[in-house]
């Protein structure tokens, strides 16, 4: 069995050299962005520094929001709410799962829509430390985010040894300062999924055994349903590590189920607990703002970008302004969601065309965007697409490349603007303003 998962060929291919570097880099080469001075420990420290600096902006935004913004009455679900402002909206569902477990109602909102890895980690931390579940979830989210920054810094160092000066710092800054990344610091699952994604890409870059990469991706599928978007990259990696077509087919047949262990375990749980292994998928209909009259109509609508232009049509049911208060108007993520989504998709395309991204990074990035567009872009009027785009790791090396190529004063101005919006979005979020 172990031979099935072992590489059949050791020759490098077009995306990575055998040592995991790209271009003409080598383990002992001098890197353009750090002059060869940064080792593993320094890379980790650099990542943690950017985590602390950018998270400080979110913390200030939260403090200003709690201190000066009025709390908005909302019909959103509040489970045993006790002022846990960092666990608003989806965070309330995660808190309830961590505290009471899952429930499923066929024709009503149900907690099975939220995948288990993050709330179960929160429950474990709560049991061990005695913290309330919402506080434990906040700890989990930020510990995983700090780890993600450290790991991403290591990944950037190894994957892009010949990148321009300051590239790595700009890429780390982008991952911390884009406005929708404030969700990474709240009681949301984004940071948990982020680290799964970085681990999978790092594993491919370092030529980890196929089964290990598949297991990491499986954890991603236990965190978010879109974790399956990493499987195409695994299949490409498997192909590159297979000497024959037969070997590739055999390995793929064994690895794909392994890469789905998280969602498979969740489906088994739902089958036992609720008699329906796909309850998590069925309950999505209860969140839908509208339903497509047919599959064909949905395909046409998505292909013609109908969800985009109806979002800005005042007479359309999904018009963003109908759900936004006067104070929230300039900061509405509902209005900005299409721009984040299209921007991220454009960056993935640019990175692939310019050969800044490997095929693994490009295909995983594209799938991470297109799967949510297909599953609920129409039904939910593109809601949360900005949040989903923020959790697409391959976007950030491309932003780092662009930032390294433009004048530093312009980068500073853009960073200041983005940092302001980051803090503002956090401030509105903690007071239940309808910005999402």
Q: What is each residue range found by the language model?
A:
Residues 132-135, 152-177, 358-363:
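Transmembrane-helix signature of polytopic, membrane-embedded enzymes
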Residues 55-72, 86-87, 227, 231-350, ...:
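Membrane-lumen/periplasm interface segments of specific transmembrane helices
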Residues 124, 136-160, 343-350:
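Transmembrane-helix motifs of polytopic, lipid-linked glycan transferases
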Residues 256-260, 405-434:
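Signature aromatic-anchored transmembrane alpha helix within multi-pass, membrane-resident enzymes
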Residues 140-144, 170-199, 203-204, 220-232, ...:
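Multi-pass, polyprenyl lipid-linked donor-dependent membrane glycosyltransferases
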Residues 18, 160-165, 200-211, 238-242, ...:
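Membrane-interface transmembrane helices that cradle and orient dolichyl/undecaprenyl
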Residues 85-103, 107-130, 302-303:
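Short hydrophobic/aromatic helix or loop-helix immediately within or flanking a transmembrane segment
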Residues 112-116, 120, 128-150, 330-339:
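Loop-to-helix entry region of an early transmembrane alpha helix in multi-pass inner-membrane enzymes
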């Amino acid at each position: 069995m172990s031979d099935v998962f072992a590489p059949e060929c050791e020759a490098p291919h077009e995306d990575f050299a055998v040592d995991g570097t790209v271009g003409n880099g080598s383990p002992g080469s001098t890197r353009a962005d750090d002059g060869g001075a940064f080792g593993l420990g320094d890379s980790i420290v650099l990542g943690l520094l950017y985590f602390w600096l950018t998270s400080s902006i979110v913390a200030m935004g939260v403090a200003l929001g709690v201190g000066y913004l009025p709390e908005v009455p909302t019909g959103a679900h509040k489970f045993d709410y006790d002022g846990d402002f960092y666990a608003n909206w989806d965070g309330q569902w995660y808190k309830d799962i961590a505290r009471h477990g899952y429930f499923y109602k066929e024709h009503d909102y149900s907690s099975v829509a939220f995948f288990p890895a993050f709330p179960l980690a929160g429950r474990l931390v709560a049991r061990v430390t005695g913290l309330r579940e919402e506080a434990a979830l906040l700890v989990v989210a930020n510990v995983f985010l700090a780890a993600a920054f450290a790991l991403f810094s290591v990944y950037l160092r190894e994957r892009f040894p010949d990148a321009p000066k300051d590239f790595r710092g700009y890429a780390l800054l982008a991952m911390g300062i884009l406005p929708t990344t404030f969700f990474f610091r709240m009681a949301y699952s984004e940071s948990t999924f982020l680290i799964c994604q970085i681990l999978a890409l790092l594993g491919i870059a370092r030529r980890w055994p196929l089964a290990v990469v598949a297991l990491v991706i499986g954890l991603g599928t236990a965190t978010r349903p879109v974790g399956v978007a990493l499987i195409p990259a695994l299949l490409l990696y498997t192909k590159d590590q297979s000497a024959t077509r037969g070997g590739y087919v055999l390995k793929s047949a064994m690895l794909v189920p392994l890469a789905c262990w998280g969602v498979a375990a969740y489906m088994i749980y739902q089958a036992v607990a609720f008699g329906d292994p796909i309850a998590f998928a069925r309950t999505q209909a209860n969140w839908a703002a509208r339903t497509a009259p047919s599959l064909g109509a949905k395909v046409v609508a998505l292909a013609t970008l109908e969800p985009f232009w109806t979002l800005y049509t005042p007479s359309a049911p999904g018009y963003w302004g109908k759900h936004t208060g006067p104070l929230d108007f300039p900061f509405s993520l509902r209005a900005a969601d299409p721009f984040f989504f299209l921007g991220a998709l454009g960056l993935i395309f640019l990175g692939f065309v310019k050969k800044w991204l490997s095929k693994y990074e490009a295909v995983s990035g594209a799938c991470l965007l297109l799967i949510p567009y297909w599953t609920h872009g129409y039904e939910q009027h593109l809601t949360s697409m900005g949040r989903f785009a923020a959790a697409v790791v391959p976007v950030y090396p491309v932003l780092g490349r662009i930032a390294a190529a433009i004048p530093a004063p312009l980068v500073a101005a853009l960073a200041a603007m983005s940092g302001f919006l980051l803090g503002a979005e956090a401030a509105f979020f903690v007071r239940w303003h309808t910005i999402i």
